[in-house]
Amino acid sequence: MRKKFVSILLMAALLSLIAISFANADTFGQVLDRWTKSRKYIGEDKLSNLEIKATYYSAEFIEAYIQKEAEANLWTQQEADDYKYKFLSALKLDEMIPIQIEFNNNAETMYMGPFDIMAKLTIKNKAYKPVDYDKRLNFKFQGKKEGLVYFPRYDEKTGKDLLEGVKTVTLELRSAIAPTITKGQPIKFLWDVSNDDPQKLYQGKTAARVETDRLLKRLEKLRKDKAEEEAKLKAINDA
């Protein structure tokens, strides 16, 4: 009787874990849907087609993705924290706005290079060019291709957060990447970012490590600036 009771408890626990796993999977799917926008074009021949997806890497999306990976790989808290730190560092989230773009091109060959003149992010009626992007996006292709594109998070002159008080942002791709199937119309994706708060990601050990990295970068920049000023002063004195 006792063995049977224990078996029932174990089965109940297992079913609970499975239920939680599926619930989390559904939650990630819902989060992904919220932050992924798509556009699909069908050619006049009704056969050729182009689908473009763009995923805005919001705090909600990143947190849900990390949680999904942690559960799928059965990571410890330390392993999850390490992955989060590396993931955030790779995304350059403290400096830039990352957007993942996916193409599934079953139409004309696409020519997208140089990609930094093909894309722009509009924030408060001002357009910003990519500051970095996956260079594979420069090459012509048919079929599937994807890559991350990074836009500035702070004003270059004032250092102000460009997303402060902003409700929406719009990613626009020029029609030149696929002029025939888009009929010369730009491709646009709009996100509501009013409730996005990347600072939520920087908590606990992750926050401490990121802050240390930031300070080290700052010190390195100060050293570089000092060296440049000393070189200028020396040039003046030697003149």
PLM features per residue range, with description:
Residues M1-L10:
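Bacterial N-terminal signal peptides that target proteins for export
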Residues L9-I18:
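Bacterial N-terminal signal peptides
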Residues N24-A239:
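Conserved functional micro-motifs across diverse proteins
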